[in-house]
């Protein structure tokens, strides 16, 4: 007669014909519902060809809540960690006690604590695996584990302890890192954080790129200051987190110029579209955004988007011009030409002042040659930038440059200091290129630069007929504009070089000059001419 033990062993190989996997029948044949002893085996053979590991048998036995006596035997057939993990999964405190009784010196198994869903079992398990004898150390270990594996009830239960020992912030950091949304909300609202910063949750959300964490921060019953939300919006723009930005914008409804400016600078077209659809920003704000887009070398699509939102009559602010020049953004110039109030002249003037050769060269495609040279040379003179002046004059036709500078000098009548600089540049250019003296004499006489006029006359060939005719013309200019010194010098110079026959014509010219002075009512000039005629009349007598 077989003993029960032998009978059980025999039944290991006696399984139902239709059994294809580990079933209740097999467990019964194995004796898992029998209170007697079971002999340890490495594997269990089913249907003579299917082999089940001891782990599979233990896992199934726990799932079917098999006899504890049998399970106590089976846990010895597997590794302690696997047995503990299965006991936690199935919330079997009795099995845990059994395992811990077998393994009094267990290593740390914190990494499998999360396998249980039972708060009681979690705490019980931690009690065994935490080796510290210090109560505070064990409590902190438990709370850190509860935070790590998302057990809010344990934290709520020990709320006073968290406050007393000021460990709320470190636990909160773990919750944020692990993205336990409900736990994060609990930390913020439970009053356990000793130094809570409003930006902490937002910063963590951006750092982790966690949208759900941002939603928690937005939905918390906290009134955030505007500057914080604006700062977070700027961060969203920099990181190009469109969902984050949209959530902040729609939830807090905060609009500031710095926001659209940053979006333009970082070329965030999608964010710009969202902002511009609100119809909140005025033309000035959009112009500032355009300036920022130029600064950041934004795409053509972004620039066109901003330009299309502008009022066509809106005056372009200086910051737009300065941004083009400072950041050398040539590509945006054709796009800005769409704005009616955009002035190439202003751009060139500022470019010359900033000595930006690239921008000046780029403007050649959009301005007539005369206009460009007039602007460049004028600004070079005004800013006393002789290097730029020389750059734009050395390869050009000398007389063309002379004529251009002459026109510039005429435009600077009310700016005597700058006009004097222009005259000096003209004389220097005239000398370097060895141009005819006559045009220079006329310019100096017309603007009453007597000292430079005298020096030029001194250097001229006074016997040259062209020079003589030029001096006579200077007489007329002087009488017309009441330049007594110029008139007197021309008169004296001509008397020295004219023949007797020429003097007669010359005196006729002087009489005509007197008529001009009378027409303009220049009494000083009239008296001067009368005195000169009376004094030198003898020169035309036979």
From Swiss-Prot:
Keyword Cytoplasm recorded: no
Induction per the UniProt record: Expressed in the early phase of the viral replicative cycle.
InterPro entries linked to this entry: MGF_505
Pfam assignment, any one: DUF249
Keywords on record: Early protein
Highest taxon listed in the record's lineage: Viruses
Family stated for the protein in its record: Belongs to the asfivirus MGF 505 family.
Function summary: Plays a role in virus cell tropism, and may be required for efficient virus replication in macrophages.
Protein name, as recorded: Protein MGF 505-11L
Organism: African swine fever virus (isolate Warthog/Namibia/Wart80/1980) (ASFV)
